[in-house]
Amino acid sequence: MSENLYNDVDPIETRDWVQAIESVIRREGHKRAHFLIEQVLKTAKINRKEFFRSSFTSDYINTISREDEYEYPGNLILEKRIRSAIRWNAIMMVLRASKKNLELGGHLSSFQSSATIYEVCFNHFFQAKNHKDGGDLVYFQGHISPGIYARSFLEGRLSEEQIDNFRQEVDGIGLSSYPHPKLMPNFWQFPTVSMGLGPLCAIYQAKFLKYLHNRELKNTSKQIVYAFLGDGEMDEPESKGAISIAVREKLDNLIFIINCNLQRLDGPVVGNGKIVNELESFFYGAGWKVIKVIWGSRWDCLLKKDTSGKLIQLMNETVDGDYQTFKSKDGAYVRKYFFGKYKETYDLVKDMTDEEIWKLNRGGHDPKKMFNALKKAKETKYKPTVILAHTVKGYGMGVIAEGKNIAHQIKKININGIIHIRDRFNIPVSNDEINKLPYVTFKKNSEEYCYIHSQRKKLGGYIPFRLSSFTGKLILPKLIDFQSLLEEQKKDISTTVAFIRVLNIILKNNSIKHLIVPIIADEARTFGMEGLFRKIGIYSSSGQKYTPQDREQLAYYKEEKKGQILQEGINELGAASSWLAAATSYSTNDFPMILFYIYYSIFGFQRIGDLFWAAGDQQARGFLIGGTSGRTTLNGEGLQHEDGHSHIQSLTIPNCISYDPAFAYEVAVIIQDGLRRMYGPSQENIYYYITTINENYYMPAMPIGVEEGICKGIYKLKTLHGTTSKVQLIGSGAILRSVCEAAEILLKDYSITTDIYSVTSFTELARNGEDCERWNMLHPNEKNKIAYVKQIMNKNPTVAATDYMKLFAEQIRHYIPSQEYHVLGTDGFGRSDSRDKLRDHFEVNAYYIVIAALNLLANINDIKKKVVEDAIMKFNIDANKINPRLS
């Protein structure tokens, strides 16, 4: 900040202005004073437009003054002992794991910087789930997991054997490196690594709690969502990208606590600036309540004595790189290089020893300051709150890591460093014991033991805790309820329309219709879903304060507080985060929701795959509908929109069940089975990805007895009987029609018999094949299991064709009974044109399928190669054209 800002050329005039405002506040109140100040600012802006603007940053001091603080409600002495024991055990856990030389890693410094913050929350704020409400939802910062394990150990929730197996999980008794519900399903609720997903998901989790409450499905009014974040993590676009949504939704049930230890993994976050000020400006500008906790109580007297204002000026001027350096040195260094900058500030500490200067603490390490910030945050109404807590990375670790750039990488500490930590936190471990790296515990009925449990009892129980299954029972629709879709459709429709009809049937089911959550990223009209606007309404926390332009239309844009549709705008990350909050409501709220997020399929896994991977970790249950799928089917939108690979991406997530249906009845069977698996008695921890298309065509009735095949991934659609050779053709989605057309050509022109199979899921077939092979390998003396696809198909030459990359259908090559298997797919970049031209370009139309089948027959000498050559000429195929993968 400029020196000129502090160079008061007329202190008397300044005093007059300040006294005038103080007088207005006393006589007429803050509102009048605020109005007058705003008028002054407006005048200043008019006269100095290019220079003057209101500042979004305040002085580098605490938002809450000492005079406005409440008394601390806890026992500070006992809490310090407990906190010190947790610090120690967290360090011992990592060091003991490191001694095994397994290259396990582990992080020490992040928790040491935030231990006080967490302990204030554990002792006074975190409400556990109880019979009255769902409790608070806490997104713990990923790198501080050892500290949470250490507390759970003192509480008796984790055993010594478990914490001794930190990052050693294969044998089933260890603890995960970071919060992972998949690995610790009764402990962690939310995965918060990779970084950036925690704050994003916390915002939409808070929004979803409001959604449940406003729809009168569940009372969530007392629940708070806490998100603990690092200042370095805030550089992730996801960390800050949705903060305006929290303001728009008035999420006063959301509190961000950002641990501003000024360091990221390699060095300072903003060494040449001030990350706290940067974040304050960003959040304040977005409309958040900002509470800065910069200095601890030991600074209070100095700030009170600072009549010149030079101390606050110095605090404002000092950059983060210097603040970090100060905490890596000692009191004498701080006296000389911080306070020594100005005579006034140097004189402030002239009667203090170097040790007293060194003990001047930062706000995030002061329980009283943190308590008041959290209390103020909980009391804030109609807006979210962010607490910016100034801390020291590696706090208490001394020369080993405190304030050092290497702090994040410290995983081993020599004996002198361990002794320093023991002495720093008064840990009752003798020199004889210290080499054993012992944990410390509290005897049952000791003051500390009783305090830990009594504080948690007051707050309803222990956290983190995760419910792995919902406790109620849902009455789900049976397949017969979708009878209208199992029959031949009177008009040509797309599978997207079939999905909408399935959704409408479910929305008429009185048992579960209130649990349905359609989620859209501003494409409802594209998918033909606008009819739902009036039927179930679009959720809006503010209702609808305007008259919609299309109010007279049947499907007008109807927003309401009890609306069911989550319309997230052009915001795939936000829509997916809402989907994730709803998809885990069965666990977080013991209230299962049945959700369908429909979107352009290419803007799913490709754009937000990290979030869908986290959904797998979080054991999400629900449906993802990849609409307008297929490289050649969304024909006019071109390269960026045409999806030929989302199924390749979805198969990387083990509990994502993927389907590419071709017919309306397949869509109905798949969704009904998904409801049974996810929400029925077995409550499987899976979620579904179903691709649908926007191409209208004839939808036949469901053949008898194909339900099992549809769900497992393949069934025989029909056989066309010829008199010569035999082949098998398999396909999925839009290209199954090309497969059927090719079979007709093979019969008509070559009298070839063709078995046609609809493959609803190449991925599930491949997984089944892999499972069979694994079982057979490990059970050599037992009868081999046979892959499902091998049971269904025969040994005749086989051609597979899909609207996706060849790799999609290549998955099952090893498991089909035929030795001759050729795959056609849409490798390459998409482009705009008619569907016929695109399918010719990507070589997946009926003619290419015929050529592929004839070629396989020629390879086994069933027909002559001349037949293939003639067919290429007959169908006007350019044999020398560039491979579409490269063109």
Swiss-Prot record:
Transmembrane segments: none annotated. Keywords: Oxidoreductase, Pyruvate, Thiamine pyrophosphate. Its EC number is 1.2.4.1. Homodimer. Part of the PDH complex, consisting of multiple copies of pyruvate dehydrogenase (E1), dihydrolipoamide acetyltransferase (E2) and lipoamide dehydrogenase (E3). It catalyses: N(6)-[(R)-lipoyl]-L-lysyl-[protein] + pyruvate + H(+) = N(6)-[(R)-S(8)-acetyldihydrolipoyl]-L-lysyl-[protein] + CO2. It comes from Buchnera aphidicola subsp. Acyrthosiphon pisum (strain APS) (Acyrthosiphon pisum symbiotic bacterium). This is Pyruvate dehydrogenase E1 component. Gene3D superfamilies: 3.40.50.920, 3.40.50.970. Pfam families: PDH_E1_M, Transketolase_C_1, Transketolase_N. Its cofactor is thiamine diphosphate. CDD domains: TPP_E1_EcPDC_like. SUPFAM superfamilies: Thiamin diphosphate-binding fold (THDP-binding), TK C-terminal domain-like. Component of the pyruvate dehydrogenase (PDH) complex, that catalyzes the overall conversion of pyruvate to acetyl-CoA and CO(2). It comes from the Bacteria.
